């Protein structure tokens, strides 16, 4: 059971600590460079259900057919307790967090994420309603909601319905690790046509601003070729031209503790070069982790 792990190893770059469930099943603490502080994560994929097989993902995956619902009553209890804990300031006395600056330990956001793809969660609407309700109670300082997704379940009517509950301050972070079919298939491990991935990003990006999350790695010993990066930047430019509003781009790599025989970390100099190219050609805010 996920909740039995005290600290879950993380799968992407930029996170200063692991997922800290502290005995809970659905809600974990996460210190993240991407959010410059403490987040609460909600695990919408307890079974690890995901329809991608990213070459850098360290979480054992099961088929998307094995998706399981979230116990929303349990989630509400865990979320309330975790929010109370953060609001009380006790988190600064936790041994695993005491070495971090105090300003990192106030709550930045609540993330819909987890061990697999959150938009595949069968009761996504109920989860979202639970989070929005906790925020509407007004017992805690305002926190934004962030959905971290590969986009594959975004077309589901219940996900579309749930996203109507997002305010302008909330964010959707969408995965885009490639600029061509072959690069996408190599990174994601699936044969979904790349144009479908871009269409999903475009569709949402026309409705609300999105944050693009891109992970680049050295795969089988080779860093991404210059042409691949150019194609990736060109895709972002086309999305913009066609009406997607890109609020920010996150550029990151595999961290060394989740490196595999296939995927290893890219040096900061290469990540910074990619970030500069995106900034120059798109004129959007880019952060490197
Ligand atoms: S989409 Fe996310 S959870 Fe799914 S395989 Fe890729 S990194 Fe892992």
Feature map (PLM): residue ranges:
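Short aromatic/hydrophobic contact patches that present stacked aromatics
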Residues: 39-43, 109-111, 146, 173
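Conserved AdoMet/S-adenosylmethionine-binding subsite of the radical SAM
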Residues: 119-266
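Conserved Radical SAM active-site core
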Residues: 59-168
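N-terminal [4Fe-4S]-dependent radical SAM core
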Residues: 1-47, 53-55, 59-77, 81-106
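Auxiliary Fe-S-binding modules of radical SAM enzymes
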Residues: 1-35, 221-289
């Amino acid at each position: 059971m996920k909740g039995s792990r005290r600290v879950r190893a993380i799968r992407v770059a930029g996170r200063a600590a692991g997922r800290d469930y502290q005995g809970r099943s659905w809600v974990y603490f996460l210190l993240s460079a991407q959010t410059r502080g403490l987040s609460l994560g909600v695990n919408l994929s307890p079974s690890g259900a995901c329809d991608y097989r990213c070459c850098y993902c360290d979480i054992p995956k099961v088929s998307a057919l094995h998706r399981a619902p979230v116990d929303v009553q349990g989630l509400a209890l865990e979320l309330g307790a975790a929010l109370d804990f953060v609001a009380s300031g006790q988190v600064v006395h936790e041994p695993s967090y005491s070495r971090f600056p105090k300003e990192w330990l106030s709550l930045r956001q609540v993330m819909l994420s987890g061990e697999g793809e959150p938009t595949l969660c069968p009761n996504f609407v109920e989860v979202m309603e639970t989070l929005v309700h906790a925020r509407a109670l007004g017992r805690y300082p305002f926190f934004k909601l962030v959905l971290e997704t590969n986009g594959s379940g975004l077309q589901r009517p219940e996900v579309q319905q749930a996203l109507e509950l997002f305010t302008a301050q909330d964010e959707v972070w969408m995965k885009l690790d490639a600029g061509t079919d072959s690069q996408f298939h190599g990174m994601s491990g699936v044969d979904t046509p790349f144009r479908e991935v871009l269409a999903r990003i475009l569709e949402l990006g026309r409705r609300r601003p999105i944050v693009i999350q891109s992970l680049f790695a050295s795969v089988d010993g080779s860093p991404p070729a210059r042409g691949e990066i150019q194609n990736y930047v060109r895709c972002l430019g086309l999305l913009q031209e066609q009406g997607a509003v890109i609020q920010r781009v996150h550029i990151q790599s595999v961290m060394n503790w989740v490196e595999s025989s296939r995927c290893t970390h890219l040096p900061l100099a290469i990540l910074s070069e990619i970030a500069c190219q995106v900034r120059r050609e798109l004129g959007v805010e880019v952060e490197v982790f």
